[in-house]
Structure formats: structure tokens, C-alpha cells
UniProtKB/Swiss-Prot annotation:
PANTHER family: ETHANOLAMINEPHOSPHOTRANSFERASE (PTHR10414), ETHANOLAMINEPHOSPHOTRANSFERASE 1 (PTHR10414:SF47). This is Ethanolaminephosphotransferase 1. One of its GO terms (molecular function) is ethanolaminephosphotransferase activity. The keyword Transmembrane helix applies. One of its GO terms (cellular component) is endoplasmic reticulum membrane. The modification N-acetylalanine is found at residue 2. The chain crosses the membrane at residues 47-69, 84-103, 123-145, 150-172, 179-201, 221-243, 256-278, 291-310, 319-341, 345-367. It is an enzyme of class 2 (transferase). Disruption phenotype: Embryonic lethality before uterine implantation of embryos on 6 days post coitum (dpc). Conditional deletion in the nervous system leads to motor deficits and neuropathology, including hypomyelination, elevated reactive gliosis and microcephaly. At the cellular level, deletion in the nervous system affects brain lipid composition, characterized by decreased levels of all phosphoethanolamine (PE), such as diacyl-PE, plasmanyl-PE and plasmenyl-PE. Belongs to the CDP-alcohol phosphatidyltransferase class-I family. GO terms for biological process: ether lipid biosynthetic process; myelination; phosphatidylethanolamine biosynthetic process. The gene is Selenoi.
Amino acid sequence: MAGYEYVSPEQLSGFDKYKYSALDTNPLSLYIMHPFWNTIVKVFPTWLAPNLITFSGFMLLVFNFLLLTYFDPDFYASAPGHKHVPDWVWIVVGILNFAAYTLDGVDGKQARRTNSSTPLGELFDHGLDSWSCVYFVVTVYSIFGRGPTGVSVFVLYLLLWVVLFSFILSHWEKYNTGVLFLPWGYDISQVTISFVYIVTAVVGVEAWYEPFLFNFLYRDLFTAMIIGCALCVTLPMSLLNFFRSYKSNTLKHKSVYEAMVPFFSPCLLFTLCTVWILWSPSDILEIHPRIFYFMVGTAFANITCQLIVCQMSSTRCPTLNWLLLPLLLVVAAVIVGAATSRLESALLYTLTAAFTLAHIHYGVQVVKQLSRHFQIYPFSLRKPNSDULGMEEQNIGL
């Protein structure tokens, strides 16, 4: 498995023909963040590889996730009567979240600044973004938690899916139109979330207990913002862009079936996980919410990464992701009553570990394969020969 190649020769050929095409119409991004990023990128030395910036930003989000896992493992820390997360943690999380957002904004600028833009860089960036979705949502959940002033773990599960589908919608657009329309909600949410973390450190989580308007709690505002952004901004914009491409006869996939293929695996993942939650003999989501969310987010990231590879290489998206097969077996065992409460927890942890290892293996092998194909180092701007590239991959674990 160490040398397994996930990218087919047809896809490699498609990557050779790939040209970046994206459109950002968000006023916040255009008039505030891009000028800010243009200034920040000048701080970085020209020898620094863009992929290293991308990976560093991603690891900041992972650190935030792990930090709050330690202080708030079960999402009760913000509830009345429970030991709260220390104020300094919220400051750290807020700063690191904004730093990660900034690094995500400057990596592409660093690539253009150093004349090192490659399809691998875009795939690396968006692939890590797909995994970041679960870290964003689960980390911010700790502000409100699952107590009487928060939202239930099932509501958060549904909100997580709203975010996941909003993310994949952009790449579904590009799969069909050839243009990546950058979503408005991302920039707005990142700036808002970073600000809320800092405010929480100043006023304490108790401030979110109080109604902010007409007896509506801040948790209701949190929920309404996620759903409203998806239904009123992300979805309408995606459908409009798809319709415009249809009217101009520039759609890459003419049949409805082929256009909708990228949604099959995410919808099946949602169905299987929801059935598991509803049929669970031990109420698995109540017992292990953080692990369950992470399992869902990791499987989703793998599905999305495969879609990104296909849309960048102009190849057909696979209808079914193989990670769903073991999940199907676990859900079947739950439905027929073959999984006891203790066994069910063990199955969840095993499945999560398997998904994580499988997704990391997929990412490492794809980066390794594309690095060889484009004759580049993934984390260095030095130009290698083929022998040196192989040694570098071994040294960094690729």
C-alpha cells in the first residue's frame, strides 16, 4: 500500500492541461482581506514554499481542536454549573483561528509571488480546506456547548452537515462549470468566529446565556446564521452560477445524472450516519459526539478530495467512495441489533481510526505522485532531479 497510486494516468494527463479559474465576488474579501493579505505576504521570505504555509495554517486548526478537546471533551464546559474553559484558551483559539485564515489567504499569493503555482498547490489547499470544515464547526461549538443554553449534539450534527454541503457545493459548481466561485460565507464566518472567540475571553461564556433580542438566545443566532448563509447565499449563488453556465452552453456534463454524481457519496454518508444515530442502542452521538463528528468530517474530506482531483483533471467523479462500505456494514450491524452498546463504541473508534489512516494515506500518496509528476518538492521551492525527489519524499515521510 505504501506505493499505491490513487491518481490514474488519465487524471495525470488532465492535470497537465489544467488552468486555474476562480471568481471571488465577496466585498469583504475583495476590499478588506485581499489588501491585508497582499501586505502580509511580503513578510514571508521568497524561499518559503506555499504548501508549507498552507499546511501550517491547517495544523493551527488541528491544534485548536485538540486544545478544546482537552478542556471541553464532551461540550459541557460552557454550560451553567460546569467548569468553564479558561479565558486564555479562547484568546489563543481566536488568534490561531485568524492566523490560520490569514495563512489560507496568503498561500496562493506566495505561489504567484515566487512563480511556483502548480495544480498540486491548489489541490493541497482545497483538500486541507475540506478537512478543516469539521475543525471549524466542532471548535466553535464549545462556545455554546450542549447545556440548557446551548444546542443539542444532534442539532450540531445537522449544522455540521449544512457547512459540509455548503463547502462541497462550490466544488460541484466547478466540476460542472469549470470555474470555482469562491463562497461568500467562508470569509464572513472566519472573521466573525475569530472575533467571537476573543469576545468570549473578555466577557465569559455566561454572556451568551442572555437573550440578545426578543428572547432569542445567541445560540439561536448562531444556528440561524449558519442555516441562513447556506440557504440565502451559498445555495442560490451556486444554482445561479450553474444556470448561467447552462444558458451559455458551457456545462462540462450535459446529463442531469452526470452533473449530480458528486452528490451521491456525500448523501449516502449523511444517510448512513443519520440512520446510525437514530437506531443506535447506546445513543452513540450523545456518548461520543466529538468522535462521531470527526468521523463524519474525515470521511467527507476524503469524498471531497476525490471530487477535487476529478474536477481539476476533467475526469468523471466516482459514484461511490469505498470508505462508505465499512460504514454500511457497521450501520447494518446496528440496525439488526448485532452491536451491543460497548461494541458500538468500539466500532465507532475503530471506524474513525481507519478513516483517518485511510485519508492520510490517500493525501500522502496523491501529493507524492503529483510531486513526481510535476518534478517538484511539495514543501520546498528547490528544483529537484528525479533521484533527489525520491530521497526527499522518504525523508519527509511521503
